[in-house]
Amino acid sequence: MRVKEQLLTLRAYVPGKNIEEVKREYGLSKIVKLASNENPFGCSARVTEALTSLASQYALYPDGYAFELRTKVAEHLGVKAEQLLFGSGLDEVIQMISRALLHEGTNVVMANPTFSQYHHHAVIEGAKVREVPLKDGIHDLDAMLEQVDDKTKIVWICNPNNPTGTYVEKQKLLSFLESVPKSALVIMDEAYYEYAGAEDYPQTLPLLEKYGNLMILRTFSKAYGLAAFRIGYAVGNEQLIGQLEVARLPFNTSTVAQSVALAALEDQAFLQECVKKNEEGLHQYYAFCKEYNVFYYPSQTNFIFLKLGIPGNEAFERLMKKGYIVRSGAAFGIHDGIRITVGLKEENDEIIELLKELVNEQVKKEETYS
């Protein structure tokens, strides 16, 4: 028995090493994971309260339509409930959209590097993938527009972008939306939206009324700290969302996920405190990079991408031996960089000291051979 030919060209997603695995392999008692862009401050205390109230519902199927959460999210965003599509994390939302829109003979346009699942699901559905290199770490919308034709079903824009943390400015996005064919669905993946504080970062929700081919993705996994529960959503044209609902599994988001997302949404004070502390953490890294002349991308997310002057895989291994798990840029095709999730202040302090050691050692090596 053979699967689709295109599946043979892909690899299953392999997450980074887990904490217990690293402890065993390196004989360490303390591990700090700064590789998956999780919220180091956890989630709202209201989430724990919500969990305690669910014991009597474990044997029951969840509300497939997620009515209560849908209503509250719609109210929070200022959109209609019918404009929302919920999924088991944005991974499932991306899968649903790809399954519904793509097939052999169609294509998608995206940046490179960016979030890998856009490419993954396009290939599974038999669509061609047109990747456009980032320009100075940012989506090159002009070059992406040149790749769009009458066969283009989706244009993916990860904003802010993973893995660089950079963003597309408002005016550039507006110009792109005016120019791109209406037959192509422009999807703004805003998984890190809550962290984006730049003045010219585009507020896309008000654009939905004018641009019927615009869709926005957001999640509870990042700033809300609910990665374990897997829940995200799309916001878009009411008619298209209704059609996509057909591709959604009947009970795709659990009662637990819906309940904790609702609780987290109601605690905006906790969210804003996380965003504030994250900004402070980013500035710890900025100060280090400027002092040690380390290249970095200014970030609108809860992570930073930087280049230490050594291969990313080497930096990854050496930091892991010290108890710090980061993400090598090699995973994204940027072999001389690493991506680091902003952690607690003391975690940032500790890993920055390790980064200083790596930079100083590299400088000494270069001086020796010069």
UniProtKB/Swiss-Prot annotation:
Keywords attached to this entry: Amino-acid biosynthesis, Aminotransferase, Histidine biosynthesis, Pyridoxal phosphate, Transferase
Keyword rRNA processing: no
GO annotation terms (biological process): L-histidine biosynthetic process
N6-(pyridoxal phosphate)lysine PTM positions: 222
UniProt protein name: Histidinol-phosphate aminotransferase 1
Gene from which the chain derives: hisC1
Binding partners and assembly: Homodimer.
This protein's record includes keyword Cell cycle: no
CDD domains assigned to the protein according to its UniProt record, in alphabetical order: AAT_like
Species for this entry: Bacillus cereus (strain ATCC 10987 / NRS 248)
Pathway assigned to this chain's UniProt record: Amino-acid biosynthesis; L-histidine biosynthesis; L-histidine from 5-phospho-alpha-D-ribose 1-diphosphate: step 7/9
Recorded family membership: Belongs to the class-II pyridoxal-phosphate-dependent aminotransferase family. Histidinol-phosphate aminotransferase subfamily.
Substrates-to-products reaction catalysed: L-histidinol phosphate + 2-oxoglutarate = 3-(imidazol-4-yl)-2-oxopropyl phosphate + L-glutamate
